[in-house]
Amino acid sequence: MKRTIWSIALLMISIGAMAQKPLIGISTGYSASDNTASVRFTYVDAVVNAGGIPVLIPLAKDSLAAAEVMNKVDALILSGGEDVHPFFYGEEPSPHFGKECVERDYFEIILIRLAKSKHIPILSVCRGMQVTNVALGGSLCQDIPSSDYSPKIQHGQYSTNTTPHHSISIVPGSRLYLILGGKALVNTHHHQCVKDLAPGMHITATAPDGVPEAMEGEGILCVQFHPESMYEKHPEMLEIYKDLVERAKEFKKK
């Protein structure tokens, strides 16, 4: 089954290579219980509407398979999902540590490091922001509600993800500032966040309690919220994906 999935992924890449639009790789979640890979369709839809060709990247234990795909795509999206296991940043799991997928952690860390080494543009979303920071040498706050962030605000909204839930302040001059301006309203569905920054990364947006909501590095934009779930009602959020597609077009020319 995994071989079939990878064959389909490579077929999609081959078809996309004949087009002029850039190929945007999207990492997927993995369910061990039924041995399936999946991702919310909102990521696929956002890439299509931003002008790219989405290519799903299922988890593979063979790092050579990851390298083969990363030789083909023009950009990489790290999608949302489970908590990143603290073993990857030298800590033990706290009592508040949530659902995990160590296989996915390991695979995505490989993808991120490959992408960075090849200067492939990266957009990391929610968990994606967290695993990117870990992959590049940073650490995470394992649970915001039990941490020292103050004043406390809710980071796990009960309303639909299409609805903004809290504000963020964006650092002037950052890539996200050029896309959204100095303030934005975002959705939120996480209980972990970036703690110690990876070398070369910079926090470029924060929530009112100081929780990091975006970080950037060379060729990398990470957001803690889900713009792909908001853009139908809030079109400015699609600009984050359009920005990635434009960066992918430039990479494709090289």
Report residues per predicted region.
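A short, gly/pro- and small-residue-rich
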Residues: 88-106
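Short, solvent-exposed loop/turn and secondary-structure capping segments
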Residues: 88-89, 135-136, 144-145
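Glycine-rich beta-strand-to-loop/alpha-helix junction loops that act as flexible
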Residues: 28, 79-81
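Catalytic nucleophile loop
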Residues: 76-78, 107, 113-139, 226
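Amide-donor transfer/coupling interface in amidating biosynthetic enzymes
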Residues: 20-74, 101-118, 145-254
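N-terminal signal peptide c-region/cleavage motif recognized by signal peptidases
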Residues: 14-15
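Glycine/Thr-rich phosphate-binding loops of Rossmann-like dinucleotide-binding domains
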Residues: 34, 85-87
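Sec-dependent signal peptide recognition
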Residues: 2-8
